[in-house]
Amino acid sequence: MRLKTAGLLTLATLLGGATNANAAMLYDIYAGLTLGAGGQTIFAGDDNNSTSAAAYGAVIGMDIPLVRIELEYNYLNASESHMHVGMINAYFKMPSTVIKPYLGIGLGTVFNGDVDDTFNIRNEAAYQGMLGLTFDIPVIPFNVDVEGRVLYAPDVFKTADAKPDLLHYDLRLKLRYVF
């Protein structure tokens, strides 16, 4: 009887361990930081104002074999404007080994910012597209993403005669810790 009980406990332990190992293979949870450099243009009718810009942010997400979903916060800092951006992103990954190309889209909002310390940025919808490469570091639980991205936000603030649009574009480095 003791041998039968010991065998059942051993089997339960092995099956429980196998279940956890398989669950870890299905998806990964991650958190990370981003840093980007590029430019932005504010379009107001025939008047276009382009400046250099930087982006700083944080992400948290879930990585599934062919898709990655994440929540992202960014602070966009240009010489004439400063703003906060919250996005929900979806990435579609090409299956590969260590270097994985991907294509991404995002939907979110631009909020709490200003242009020339004169105009307050309204809470407006924002859209973005990303194209990049993920470098999977197999020995340590980090992934490094290098990507180009374009963010578009229509009617970010209102003047007496115009509702300018924002186009932000940058090259971004993202470091993700995989739990």
Model-derived features: positions:
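Contiguous, function-dense segments enriched for cysteine-driven chemistry
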Residues: 142-153, 157, 168-170
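Solvent-exposed loop/turn segments connecting transmembrane beta-strands
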Residues: 44-52, 76-83, 117, 159-160
